[in-house]
Amino acid sequence: LAQLPFYYRQLFVGNQFTSSSLIDNRNREIALAQDTARRMKQKVGGAMLVIGEAYSGMSYFCENIGTQLFDGSIYRILTPLHGSVRPVDFVRAFQRQIGQKGSVSQLIESTPFNSVFLLHDIELWWERTPQGYEIINQLVDIIQRYSFDYHFILNCNTHAFQLIKQVTDWESAFLNTIQLSPFSEEQIRKTILSRHYSGGLSLVYQDIPEKEINANEWETLFKKYKLISNGNIGVALRMWLRNIERVKNQILYIKDPEELQMPPIEEKEWLVVLSQFVLHKQLSFLQLTRIFPNEEKARVNLWVQDLIRANLLIRLNKITIGINPYLYPYIINSLKKAQLLNS
């Protein structure tokens, strides 16, 4: 990866939010979003929620429909990297984006009618603790109060969504919930190759120059991407970078993706901890101690350090830890097998 031009790498792991048209690789979901946007503009009340697996492109999808289906100003309400369940941080997120002081209600009312509020990764505003639902409940109140005059588009990973809806009334706040489906082999091929072509580099696959690769060879290659990634486009994009063996004279030499041969996760404690990272996306050690209040801090720390050494978890910064994205499908499959996640 160090040999790759920065701009090429960013095409696959950076935030790709700029687009002059609706994306063309999620026709079913776009049709649902168009219908929902039409109803939202009729001021019937309610937000649009997009759910899916982590790395499945929820933020990209929401940014695309927010800019292409609505005419109002866009306000992106961003979470702290490791998340927060403190209402004061939620208020500050609105203040930073809108550039004013005041309560959330005052800030929303200061924006033009029909403004669009994008809230990515709602699971980062939530915690599986008794006090962890306060911001979720506040969001429900905000949507029910303001969605007649303003538009709200949210996204959340599907596993957190299933849990949160069991203990809150937040489903009542949504006009529609759109589930992002796994990508097909063809969708993965189109997405990866369109980004590759944008990067301006050529490639060699199995000693065959790019222009000489036939349809069957492309099909064989991307079937493997589909199988190993479980159709998760974010995982597939990272796999593409990982399978670049070398770069020479603006030419990429790529190999077939290979499924990582990982032993079964047999430690029950590891599985339980990993399930919390799937639900919350990323966590600090302090958050973990709140989620596991009956465990000694030293014991929780030992689990985390073991999972980092096993490369299942990675440090995102000094205090924030997350799942290794390359191993996400393997971890999801392991948790489903252990019945810690729904299939």
List each model region and its residues.
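A short, basic N-terminal segment
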Residues: 1-40, 341-343
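Walker A/P-loop nucleotide-binding motif
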Residues: 42-64
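AAA+/P-loop NTPase substrate/partner-engagement loops
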Residues: 68-97
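Conserved Walker B catalytic segment
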Residues: 107-171
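Conserved small helical "lid"/interfacial subdomain of P-loop NTPases
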Residues: 178-218, 228
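Winged-helix-like regulatory helical subdomains adjacent to P-loop NTPase cores
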Residues: 223, 237-299
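Short amphipathic alpha-helical interaction segments
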Residues: 293-310, 315
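Short, amphipathic alpha-helical interaction segments positioned at domain boundaries
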Residues: 327-343
